[in-house]
Amino acid sequence: MPRRGYSKPGSWGSFWAMLTLVGLVTHAAQRADVGGEAAGTSINHSQAVLQRLQELLRQGNASDVVLRVQAAGTDEVRVFHAHRLLLGLHSELFLELLSNQSEAVLQEPQDCAAVFDKFIRYLYCGELTVLLTQAIPLHRLATKYGVSSLQRGVADYMRAHLAGGAGPAVGWYHYAVGTGDEALRESCLQFLAWNLSAVAASTEWGAVSPELLWQLLQRSDLVLQDELELFHALEAWLGRARPPPAVAERALRAIRYPMIPPAQLFQLQARSAALARHGPAVADLLLQAYQFHAASPLHYAKFFDVNGSAFLPRNYLAPAWGAPWVINNPARDDRSTSFQTQLGPSGHDAGRRVTWNVLFSPRWLPVSLRPVYADAAGTALPAARPEDGRPRLVVTPASSGGDAAGVSFQKTVLVGARQQGRLLVRHAYSFHQSSEEAGDFLAHADLQRRNSEYLVENALHLHLIVKPVYHTLIRTPK
């Protein structure tokens, strides 16, 4: 790296220059009393000091160590004239590495070597600009050299960009597993589950590992059009990955075949290459699905257990399971709508519907906070402010639901945005089965703010899902 000035490594002049500069950074923002009764005035020169630090790095003035960063597998070497004191303040590894030498050769993967200048810059001024492709190498460098603040910052960046739908979730998931970053791993897994349709249609789907695939197939909170879409996504993955038969058969057995209508099951058996190859491994599950669709749920429950995951719907976006609801200017006033869902996934109930009424209130107040204008003695009491309330969503059946014997309904509300014609889920709220609303629905949302993460062009995009959950009413006779 070119530089305009240079001091002898380890010189006392270099030491005192650096010590003075660090002192300036430490005391850049301070309070000063201007005398008399005047208020204290803030004197903040931190930006100027940061600029001087950047100049130190760029020009190499008063440097006392040299870092030679070689990209693995190449002859490319990048040279950085740096300052032992600043590197050691952030990294115990640098402190130990440079304690007895003024020059170090660092071997780094090519992607890490390419962003090493940004990494060093962060050690000097505490900021950097991150691109999606640079997140993993920067996080890897921060982890290797023990710069915990940068490690947390890059991980936060990755989680935030997952929520925005821009991040390569599959690659980041595998990276998180390899580094043991449980928080990032769980964030990636949640994003993939909530946006499986978009991921399965992208180039990332081919990079999914068998372990990640198995993690996804076990989840009931997958968001996708229907179970048939999941089967087709799995079949496409099998065609690309060509895993061992045991892996393929275990994955095929994770499909919830009772959630697929009989007509579509017949088509799968006739046309699916995966079933043609591994059909015997799932023959019992297909028979179970046909039996489930042929009998009434009450009759089926007399002989078979319906509490297994095979009979629990996932978060399906198909019209039979719910409806989208876009609320423009959601902070303005109360809104209501209604929609219908099928009574249950059984073919026996294919023509039976349940009507649901939905009420949205942007500023609902609990009874304890509702306005009271006077007490018994006529003394005026303060009214609660509208901003004291919170958004509320209530979903109730339009009738008593007498046809729903042996069934309870699990309600889920997805909050998200549409990008390129696909629903991108940012938040999901599940109702307790005995409740008509989600207690924490948009609890921290500011719907008054137009750039709120919950709004898209000042509209709240919801998708309401109702999942019937069967209960075993009569034990199977022995």
Curated annotation (Swiss-Prot):
Residues 63-132 form the BTB domain. Gene3D superfamilies: 1.25.40.420, Potassium Channel Kv1.1, Chain A. Residues 1-28 form the signal peptide. Glycans are attached at residues 61, 100, 195. SUPFAM superfamilies: POZ domain. InterPro entries: BACK, BTB-POZ/Galectin-3-binding, BTB/POZ_dom, SKP1/BTB/POZ_sf, TRAF_BTBD17. Keywords: Glycoprotein, Secreted, Signal. Residues 169-269 form the BACK domain. One of its GO terms (biological process) is negative regulation of viral genome replication. GO terms for cellular component: extracellular region; plasma membrane. The keyword DNA-binding does not apply. This is BTB/POZ domain-containing protein 17. It comes from Homo sapiens. The gene is BTBD17.
